[in-house]
Amino acid sequence: MVDPVAALCNYNVLEVIFSYLELDDLSHCSQVCKSWYHFLNDENSDVWRWHCLNKLPKESLKSDLLSSVPTYKTKLRAYFHAWSPNDCSRNVYIKPNGFTLHRNPVAQSTDAARGKIGFRHGRHTWEVIWEGPLGTVAVIGISTKEAALQCHGYVALLGSDDQSWGWNLVENHLLHNGDMQGSYPLLNNAPKYQVGERIRVILDCEDNTLSFEKNYEFLGVAFRGLPDKKLYPTVSAVYGNTEVSMVYLGTPLDG
């Protein structure tokens, strides 16, 4: 019979030790034994709470931005998948909350940003929230590392080459390799995007498809035949002082 006092002591000791480990080390620890796996599988445990409070900006934890990732562990994961300050146009900066990009008001420029982590395997979904005016062109989608992040003029940069795929929210057009691939979604009088709406981007690296959801409604497959390359969440914008947030959600739920 297990002494409950001893069990509690072991739990508290593990909690303290795990709180001081790096996140990569926690991943390895979860594979040591079933006990440690179940301990770390509690996504709202004090261990994940401690790491969350110490790594995430307080501004993001106090906002509604992370409402779709309710546990401490999923908030941490979203933070490490957010926009990359090192992989964006020179006219873009990432705000202190870590999840929102701001495009500076630079004339005759189109500017883009990619997420920190790209995907080549599995199924992934993330939310994009355009929190400022769209302007004449506002594109969300994916790109490889080879796709350009800045160009002259006000154009649909994302989707302008063979390394990027995008949905222009202003005109409801799909874009790839510089061509308009058709209207999207395939609805009569499809409603235009409203600032502040959350769009879910669904990347399936097994079926090589990209799809979108809006207001929890699946809009259909937008692109098929995606290449076997690492693909990154990406947006491109033209409007000065507009802001776009991205929150990684993990594996999409079917149904």
From Swiss-Prot:
Residues 61-253 form the B30.2/SPRY domain. The keyword Protein biosynthesis does not apply. Transmembrane segments: none annotated. It is found in: Synapse. InterPro entries: B30.2/SPRY, B30.2/SPRY_sf, ConA-like_dom_sf, F-box-like_dom_sf, F-box_dom, FBXO45-Fsn/SPSB_families, SPRY_dom, SPRY_FBXO45. Gene3D superfamilies: 1.20.1280.50, 2.60.120.920. Its main location: other. Keywords: Neurogenesis, Synapse, Ubl conjugation pathway. One of its GO terms (cellular component) is pole plasm. Pathway: Protein modification; protein ubiquitination. It holds the Pfam family SPRY. Residues 3-51 form the F-box domain. It comes from the Eukaryota. One of its GO terms (biological process) is synapse assembly involved in innervation. The keyword Ribosomal protein does not apply. Component of an E3 ubiquitin ligase complex composed of hiw and Fsn. Belongs to the FBXO45/Fsn family. PANTHER family: F-BOX_SPRY DOMAIN-CONTAINING PROTEIN 1, SPRY DOMAIN CONTAINING SOCS BOX PROTEIN. Required in the presynaptic motoneuron to down-regulate the levels of wnd and restrain synaptic terminal growth at the neuromuscular junction (NMJ). This is F-box/SPRY domain-containing protein 1. The lineage of its organism: Eukaryota, Metazoa, Ecdysozoa, Arthropoda, Hexapoda. The gene is Fsn.
